[in-house]
Curated annotation (Swiss-Prot):
The keyword Transport does not apply. ATP binds at G38, V39, T40, G41, S42, G43, K44, T45. Belongs to the UvrB family. One of its GO terms (molecular function) is ATP binding. This is UvrABC system protein B. Residues 429-595 form the Helicase C-terminal domain. Forms a heterotetramer with UvrA during the search for lesions. Interacts with UvrC in an incision complex. The gene is uvrB. Signal peptide: none annotated. A motif (Beta-hairpin) lies at residues 91-114. GO terms for cellular component: cytoplasm; excinuclease repair complex. Residues 25-182 form the Helicase ATP-binding domain. Residues 622-657 form the UVR domain. SUPFAM superfamilies: C-terminal UvrC-binding domain of UvrB (SSF46600), P-loop containing nucleoside triphosphate hydrolases (SSF52540).
Amino acid sequence: MNQFKVISKFNPTGDQPKAIKSIAKGIEKREKFQTLIGVTGSGKTFTMANIIEKVQKPTLVLAHNKTLAAQLCSEFREFFPNNAVEYFVSYYDYYQPEAYVAQSDTYIEKDASINDEIDKLRHSATSALFERKDVIIVASVSCIYGLGNPEEYKKLTISLREGMEKDRDEIIKKLVEIQYERNDIDFSRGTFRVKGDVLDIFPASSSSKAVRVEFFGDEIDRIKEFDVLTGETITKLKHISIFPASHFATSKDRLEVAIKDIEEELEERVKELVSQDKILEAQRLKQRTNFDIEMMREVGYCTGIENYSRVLDGRAKGTPPQTLLDYFPQDFLLFIDESHVTLPQVKAMQAGDKSRKDSLVEYGFRLPCAYDNRPLTFKEFENKLNQVVFVSATPAKYELEYSTNTAEQVIRPTGLLDPEIIVKPVKGQIDDLYTSIQETIKRGFRILVTTLTKKMAEDLTDYLKEMGVKTRYLHSDIDTIERMKIIHDLRKGEFHVLVGINLLREGLDIPEVALVTILDADKEGFLRSETSLIQTVGRAARNSESKVIMYGDVITKSMEKTIKETNRRRKIQMEYNEEYGIVPKTIIKDIREVIQISDIAEERKEYDNLNEALKSYNNDIDKLIEKYEEEMKEAAQNLQFEKAAHLRDVIYKLKKDKETEL
């Protein structure tokens, strides 16, 4: 069995060894909840990697968005090149859920664009859990959504061995049952092809490698893995497991039982609707459900089959759905990254889903069993947990209340200190701010200014521009790409001051920033809470010459706690630096890290100028669509989701224009 092994030229330093030892010991002692408090730049991911190596448990790392999950996955792959590090997020590039708006009698059909590459990665993640123990899966909150029964998934797996007596046609039938399609021409993921005694299978978890099974009569003579593009043999295999092409694949026996249950529920619900004098709704439900049943009987699945997942799984009404958490063995470990943001997200998921389903069930679009195709409630999520480590610079009440052990990671290996905090009165704050900005610009650094309202942010931006200061305003209407472009320009020095409201917290690490100012710091509220203030102060923690100015006439409890905590961390780091002779030094990351993303914003302009693009293709709209489709697939393969989604929208527009012309 493969062991987790961290590969790195660095060894744990500062607070890392102590934190690793403390958390690992807690895991060995069966502590259920622990917290790792780690400041910005202290190497929390490296600590997590070393904990995984120590405890040797299959691990799930939960992040609060796709981008952060991709970043963490990339870092873990660097630390664990010889282990399975997988990525599991929502596979929708675009998703419009099914809904019904009663006021306008509008039914909105489910519309989705599935990213084939992410679907492959999801299959790779689940199959890895059945094949090995050394698995790390980095996931978004998508992992608390229904995924199909892991027992059924495992039961439907086709196991093939060299020398095994197996009828070729029987294997083909089983492949169809687990939702593989026969395609002798377009051989792609989730398909198989047959030529004489040779059966080629393209696994759902692969993008470039397929499996060739050669028969001699009814015996499997040879199994080999080959490159789909070149046809060259990669390796000879003694055994291969073919996992289902869909997580919702169901055996024929189970499907027949499920169909009977669906028919019974339909009969009951139709009677109920008729008794309420809802004849139209009853007729609609009967028609839609019978069509789905017919599809299931014919091809084994139907559009929206997930709405019947509770019946297909044989679960009782109201019981929690099976999720990625159920695919893990019982002794798995869970890290919840940025837990102060991620946990509230998990808590909010189920309520929104139920309110949408209410009208679908009430007006006869769905059976009541659709309610159980949902994310986990927070209580259900808690019940599925084994051992959890919350990771945050500012853990919330829940984490601190439930944790029986807390490890702190304050010391940064770089020696950088938390910034000095200065409190100044509100009166004359704009004049003082202007003076502080000029001083910081002279030293060659940048400035972040956080305000309480949109109006104030806009007015302040206009004022600073009038005073000759190069200023930009980062507001909530700006999309991810444009936001990254603005940050890129700030780092390059295209402008010097960035003004924002609630946008200067997690994930905005700019080493060139030497001044962070917080206007109206004494106005208590969620934007000026202790958590919010500590996160905002952390934005200045990448520069050795940085400071934070809080403008307020009184020192609130949140301000007091933030100042006290920052000073405590400064003291610890200063003592460490003195002991080991470390001189704090700003580490300026290569600006190219952001250029890759900001380049997409430039590409958008190119894609949006369709008239120019068509001219360069002699007005051949089909050729242009073909080019953009290739670029979209390439972008998705490189996990450039924003670019892929934008290209999809451009292609859709071109196809619409083409239809109009016809």
